[in-house]
Amino acid sequence: MRADEYAFFEPPFIAFAHRGGAMYSPNLGRENSLQAFAEAVALGYRYLETDVHATADGVLIAFHDSKLDRVTDRRGAIAKLTYEEVSRAKIHGIDDIPRFEDLLTSFPDARFNVDAKSAGSVDLLSDLIIAHGAQDRVCVNSFGIRRLHRLRKRLGSKVASGASGLAIAVYRFAPQLTKIINTRAPVLQIPMEQKILGVRLRVLTPALVQAAH
């Protein structure tokens, strides 16, 4: 399917606010916080990017890393902590870690591009999307191909999803094959370049762009 066949892409967009606009100066150090997302929305962003992890007791939180250490005032692996324990941590020593559900309810007009970072997050994410009727507001993705396949299976074909790493490799190295191989994704989420075995490889090429369109 093409991207324009998904309701997710109906509002025109220029850019995503990555982790809630983490590089915008008022948000520095406050990535994936409600405050960061609110700043992005106030700037006019309709599309927001985030990541999700599951706590030990099955609460889905918007957080990039598997551990609290880098951006909060506490330490520990999220998958081994209860939500009560995680909720004591403050992003940049200031902000609460939001649940993904909090993002859906706090920003009802926003679209979310969500990366399921752990196996435990997949069913929780799909359940929340369905419970909130947010199928048109969310695009799901995961670097783990099994996680991505399970998301697609549980959410169905009407929910937009990103291409797998294998599909991206086909677009990059054998774009002619995309005419006969169904990548099952309307979205290619790629870096400009990627470092592989110490060598910087250009990912975004004219041939890839042409194949994607």
Residues of each region from the PLM?
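Phosphate-group recognition and catalysis centered on beta-loop-alpha active-site segments
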Residues: 1-213
